[in-house]
Design a protein with these regions (language model features):
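Glycine-rich phosphate-binding loop plus the immediately following alpha-helix
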Residues: 1-4, 82-110, 119-169
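Short hydrophobic/aromatic-rich motifs at helix boundaries and adjacent loops
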Residues: 4-7, 42-45, 75-77, 142
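Short beta-strand-loop/turn "lid" adjacent to the catalytic site in phosphate-handling enzymes
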Residues: 8, 12-70
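A broadly conserved amphipathic alpha-helix scaffold signal in soluble, globular proteins
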Residues: 30, 34, 71-75, 102-109, ...
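A broad structural signal for alpha-helix termini and local helix breaks/kinks
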Residues: 40, 77, 108-112
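Short helix-loop-beta connector
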Residues: 42-44, 113-116
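Glycine-rich phosphate-binding loop and adjoining helix at the ATP-binding site
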Residues: 46-105
Length: 169
């Protein structure tokens, strides 16, 4: 799959070749999801999160392209599938990595830390950092912060530069 993505020439026009690769990626993910569901049969899986395979991302210009068909994945797995995270995050002012800050928040939620804010670093293809600040009643101007970020924390996350992409082949 990696070679097919790398060698695909027509990203701009979303060629038939890319559509075929997208279908193949979706079937591959469906197989993995089915295997995970079978191996964790004691848990009821209600929903699957699927971000696909990113083949182009430019947060500054709000452009991102992922291969993977969430609707097809839902049909294949017979599960509800949440997808298109990166695109929706860009549309709403983010940088296209909406799940990482939530994961970081959950990591520190139950730790009794003396110093705030906490900054978590995620070194993926592109590195991003999440600043997690504790909210105190006097810090909250209205309910928007509480509804958006959770009861006790405010998150700020952004891409900060290259990460593993420098060593990826």
């Amino acid at each position: 799959l990696r070679d097919k993505i790398t060698n695909s020439k027509d990203l701009k026009n979303y060629s038939e070749e890319l559509k075929s690769i997208e279908k193949e990626i979706t079937f591959f993910h469906a197989k993995i999801v089915d295997e995970m569901i079978k191996s964790h049969s004691k848990f009821e899986i209600d929903i699957v999160g699927f971000h696909g395979q990113t083949i182009f991302h430019n947060a500054e210009e709000k452009i991102t392209v992922q291969l993977g068909d969430g609707k097809l994945l839902s049909q294949l797995t017979k599960k509800k599938v949440v997808y298109d995270f990166r695109h929706n995050d860009l549309k709403n002012g983010g940088q296209g990595a909406p799940l990482t800050p939530i994961f970081h928040q959950n990591l520190v939620r139950n730790i009794d830390l003396e110093w705030w804010p906490v900054v978590a670093l995620n070194i993926g293809g592109i590195s991003n950092a999440t600043s997690i600040s504790r909210l105190y009643p006097m810090d909250v101007e209205d309910d928007v912060d509480l509804k958006r970020y959770g009861k006790d924390y405010k998150l700020f996350a952004e891409d900060i530069g290259p990460g593993n992409c420098l060593i990826d082949e």
